[in-house]
A protein has these predicted regions:
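Catalytic loop of short-chain dehydrogenase/reductase
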Residues: 129-154, 159-160, 164-168
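A short, exposed helix-loop element centered on a Lys and neighboring polar residues
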Residues: 113-114, 160
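Conserved glycine-rich cofactor-binding loop
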Residues: 13-14
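Substrate-binding pocket helix/loop in short-chain dehydrogenase/reductase
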Residues: 89-90, 97-102, 192-193
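A conserved structural motif in NAD(P)-dependent oxidoreductases
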Residues: 196-207
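C-terminal substrate-recognition "lid" of short-chain dehydrogenase/reductases
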Residues: 205-227, 232
Length: 236
């Protein structure tokens, strides 16, 4: 088994996820990358195990944790990157929309995080970083994602509670809350840049840098790190 640190990254095949995989490998981590189409977008190697599946299913979560332990021996970092965002008026959300958001954003966090924490308790160390959303606590008029933000805001609360629950066990929990990021999830809309005072979208690198900081900052836990070009300042 390798002595390198190991990271599990969900939603790993595109946008922020692909950037996270690349950067963690560059930083010397072994990586287990999960997504629905991991093998189509990524190339496995001695340091990179690919796992395809629906992260909202218990089986996928179990397989990811098993892959990390069986191949690399530990789980040092879990990055809960998988997520979906639906933008529509509250009265237009359907039951199918609600179920999809809960499956990916909540069950996709719950199943794999619970299993990972059980392993981290054995190690007496570990770090969980989750990607949430700046809109969860900084709503913007005209951006109608109330049910999406119900899930992301719930994650923020859970993360802060988990940070307290497991502080004595050496396990840290934090979140990165992006604003608008230049990824395929966000169509090329020139108005997006006006949603934050910086007047430009965040890049994938901006988000990856924030995740790496939280993964390596040993005394930081329970933080929701906004990466949104000063939008919380509400000065524009």
């Amino acid at each position: 088994m390798s002595d390198k640190k190991t990271a599990i990254i969900t939603g790993a095949s595109g946008g922020i996820g692909a950037g996270l995989v690349e950067r963690f490998l560059q930083e010397g981590y072994s990586v287990v990358a999960t997504s629905r189409d991991a093998h189509r977008k990524l190339t496995a190697s001695g340091s990179l195990v690919l796992l395809e599946g629906d992260i909202g299913k218990q089986q996928t979560a179990a397989q990811a944790v098993e892959a990390a332990i069986n191949n690399f021996g530990t789980i040092d970092v879990l990055v809960n990157n998988a997520g979906i965002f639906l933008n529509k008026p509250f009265t237009d959300f359907t039951t199918e929309d609600f179920d999809a958001l809960v499956s990916v954003n909540l069950l996709g966090f719950f199943y794999i995080t619970q299993r990972t924490v059980k392993e981290m308790l054995k190690q007496k160390s570990g770090c969980v970083v989750s990607i949430t959303a700046a809109l969860a606590d900084r709503p913007i008029a005209g951006t109608n994602g109330s049910i999406s933000m119900m899930t992301k805001g719930g994650l923020n609360s859970a993360i802060q509670n988990l940070a307290t629950e497991y502080a004595k066990d050496g396990i840290r929990f934090n979140a990165v809350a992006p604003g608008v990021v230049n990824t395929p999830m966000h169509p090329d809309d020139p108005n997006d840049s006006t949603l934050q005072p910086a007047m430009k979208k965040a890049t994938v690198k901006d988000i990856v840098d924030a995740v790496l900081y939280l993964a390596q900052a040993g005394h930081v836990s329970g933080e929701i790190l906004h990466v949104d070009g000063a939008a919380p300042a509400r000065r524009w």
